[in-house]
């Protein structure tokens, strides 16, 4: 094995990401249009992450998407982790912890305020152990429909939230895998 780590390149490496994701995840939802939309057209910024290679073969990745959140009405730059995986043939070698550690340093270097990792039952302990994330509990969310805007949303009732601008909402509705119209 010749393991190396590189900063993710979401313009150049989409084909490699598709191959890795489709081998690690049960759904075959990954394609060029979808990943280009998700990683390169997000109005909050491009995908940021660490890729792990064995020679020239992508075997793992930890990364995420920039999203603006508010904590007690202060705007924060946060990374939400997505599509985190290690190839089945390389699991059990502590690669996730090594990649996650490098990812945490990359996030700090790029002046983000934090990482949100929404993990399943097997991923959550790995996140906590690898970079000492704090488990805040299960995700609670609400969705509002209709005329929700700054005039009728009382942000003082919520400590932590994200507001979806027209630009972000339009981007989200243009997901090529989930056409709305």
Report each predicted region and the residues it spans.
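Conserved N-terminal entry element of GNAT/NAT acetyltransferase domains
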Residues: 1-12, 147-152
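Amide-forming acyltransferase catalytic core, primarily the GNAT-like/NAT-type
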Residues: 16-22, 26-47, 52-53, 108-112, ...
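Exposed loop/turn and edge beta-strand positions of beta-sandwich/beta-sheet ligand-binding modules
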Residues: 46, 75, 80
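Conserved beta-strand in the GNAT
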Residues: 49-51, 57-67, 80, 85
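Glycine-rich, histidine-containing beta strand-loop boundary motifs that form or position
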Residues: 62, 118-121
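A short, polar/charged loop-to-alpha-helix boundary motif
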Residues: 68-75
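Conserved hydrophobic beta-strand within the GNAT/NAT acetyltransferase core sheet
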Residues: 81, 114-118
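Conserved acetyl-CoA-binding loop-helix of GNAT-fold acetyltransferases
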Residues: 86, 91-106
């Amino acid at each position: 094995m010749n393991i190396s780590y590189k900063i993710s390149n979401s313009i150049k490496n989409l084909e490699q990401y598709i191959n890795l994701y489709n081998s690690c995840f049960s759904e075959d939802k990954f394609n060029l249009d979808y990943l280009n939309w998700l990683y390169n057209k997000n109005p909050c910024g491009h995908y940021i992450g660490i890729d792990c290679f064995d020679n020239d073969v992508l075997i793992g990745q930890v990364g995420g998407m920039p999203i603006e959140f508010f904590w007690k009405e202060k705007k924060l730059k946060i990374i939400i982790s997505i599509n985190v995986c290690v190839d089945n043939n390389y699991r059990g070698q502590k690669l996730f912890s090594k990649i996650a550690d490098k990812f945490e340093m990359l996030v700090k270097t790029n002046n983000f305020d934090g990482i949100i990792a929404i993990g399943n039952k097997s991923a959550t302990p790995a996140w906590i152990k690898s970079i000492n994330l704090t488990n805040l509990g299960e995700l609670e969310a609400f969705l509002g429909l209709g005329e929700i805007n700054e005039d009728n949303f009382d942000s003082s009732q919520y400590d932590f939230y994200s507001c979806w601008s027209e630009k972000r909402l339009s981007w989200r509705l243009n997901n090529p895998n989930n056409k709305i119209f």
